[in-house]
From Swiss-Prot:
The keyword Ribosomal protein is annotated on this UniProt entry: yes
Protein name: Large ribosomal subunit protein bL28
GO terms, molecular function: structural constituent of ribosome
Gene: rpmB
GO cellular component, one term: cytosolic large ribosomal subunit
C-alpha cells in the first residue's frame, strides 16, 4: 500500500531536521492518511478509500464524495478514484436525461 492520498495525490515529502547548531539530517514528512468509508449518493454504494485528513475535510466541504470527485482534477486522483468519477458522471447524465 503506497503512502499516497487517493483523492488529492498527496505523497511523502522529504526535508531536513535542522538542529540549533544548524546540523541537517534527512527526514520524511508523511501525509496524515486515514482509511475511511465514503458513501456515493448517486451510485447508492459505499467505497473504502485511503485519504489524507485534509482531503476528508475537502470532501465534507464540497458536500460529499460525489461533489468532490466531479470537481476534482483527474491528474490528482488515483486510478480507482478516476473510475469512480466516471461512473458518477455517467449516472448523473442518465438521471438528467
Amino acid at each position: 500500500m503506497s503512502r499516497a492520498c487517493e483523492l488529492t495525490g498527496k505523497t511523502v515529502q522529504y526535508g531536513n531536521n535542522v538542529s540549533h547548531a544548524n546540523n541537517k539530517t534527512r527526514r520524511r514528512f508523511l501525509p496524515n492518511l486515514c482509511n475511511v468509508t465514503l458513501i456515493s449518493e448517486v451510485l447508492q454504494q459505499s467505497y473504502r478509500l485511503r485519504v489524507s485528513a485534509s482531503a476528508l475535510r475537502s470532501v465534507e466541504h464540497r458536500g460529499g464524495l460525489d461533489g468532490f470527485l466531479v470537481k476534482a482534477d483527474d491528474k490528482e486522483l488515483s486510478q480507482r478514484a478516476r473510475l469512480l468519477k466516471r461512473q458518477i458522471v455517467k449516472k448523473k447524465a442518465e438521471k438528467a436525461a
